[in-house]
């Protein structure tokens, strides 16, 4: 479990470019662009799905919940990062 959390923290920090402890839509978009083409609509859909409290940012807790529900996707992202 501790290894899983450490890996998620590592990935989260890659997305959290300014280190403020949350991922904005622009940080999400910039990081996803390194993985390939992504549209603004796709970024907004992802934000809406992951940002469960609707504050406009993805917290580590929200990221962790999303990662656990989508472990295959996160494993693929981990391989890239």
Curated annotation (Swiss-Prot):
Ca(2+) 2 binds at residues 51, 53, 55, 62. One of its GO terms (molecular function) is calcium ion binding. It comes from the Eukaryota. Ca(2+) 1 binds at residues 16, 18, 20, 22, 27. The keyword Transferase does not apply. InterPro entries: EF-hand-dom_pair (IPR011992), EF_Hand_1_Ca_BS (IPR018247), EF_hand_dom (IPR002048), EF_hand_pair_protein_CML-like (IPR039647). The keyword Glycoprotein does not apply. Keywords: Allergen, Calcium, Metal-binding, Repeat. Residues 3-38, 41-73 form the EF-hand domain. This is Polcalcin Syr v 3. It comes from Syringa vulgaris.
């Amino acid at each position: 479990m501790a290894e899983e959390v450490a890996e998620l923290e590592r990935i989260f920090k890659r997305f959290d470019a300014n280190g403020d402890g949350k991922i904005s839509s622009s940080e999400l978009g910039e990081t996803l662009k390194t993985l390939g083409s992504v549209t603004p609509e796709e970024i907004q859909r992802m934000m809406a799905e992951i940002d469960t409290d609707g504050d406009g940012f993805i917290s580590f807790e929200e990221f962790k919940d999303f990662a656990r529900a989508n472990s295959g996707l996160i494993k693929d992202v981990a391989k890239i990062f």
